[in-house]
Each structure stands twice: as C-alpha cells, then as structure tokens.
From Swiss-Prot:
InterPro entries: Frog_antimicrobial_propeptide, FSAP. The keyword Ribonucleoprotein does not apply. It comes from the Eukaryota. This is Raniseptin-7. It comes from Boana raniceps. It is found in: Secreted. Has antibacterial activity. Residues 30-44 have a biased composition (Acidic residues).
Amino acid sequence: MAFLKKSLFLVLFLGIVSLSICEEEKREGEEEEKQEEENEELSEEELRERRALLDKLKSLGKVVGKVALGVAQHYLNPQQ
C-alpha cells in the first residue's frame, strides 16, 4: 500500500510540474504574439509616416520645379 501511495504522489507531482511548465510556455507564447502584433502596428505606423513624408517631399519638389522653371523662363526671355 505504501508503494502505491508513493507512486501516486509521484505521478501527481510530475503531472502538476508538467502542467505548470505548459502554462508558463503558454504565457510566454501569448506574450510573444502580443509583442509581434505591437511590432506590426509600429511598422504600419512607420509606413504611414514615411508615405506622408514622401508625399510632402513630392509636393515640395513640384513647387521648387515650378519656381525654377519660372526663374529660368524669366532670365531666358527678358522681354517683359
């Protein structure tokens, strides 16, 4: 009978230990997934910021080009 008690306690102990290890791994997995989602959100925000910056630079380039064209035409055609 004592042998069965010891065996039963050993099985229960090992089951509890393995269960706690599984729970810990599950929590770590959830934390990693959450962190990956945050990284994806950050990268999406960075992409939006870069697109906005490129749009501003594009607009600025158009304005500078028009000004340069106007100055060049003014100096090439000084009749006015």
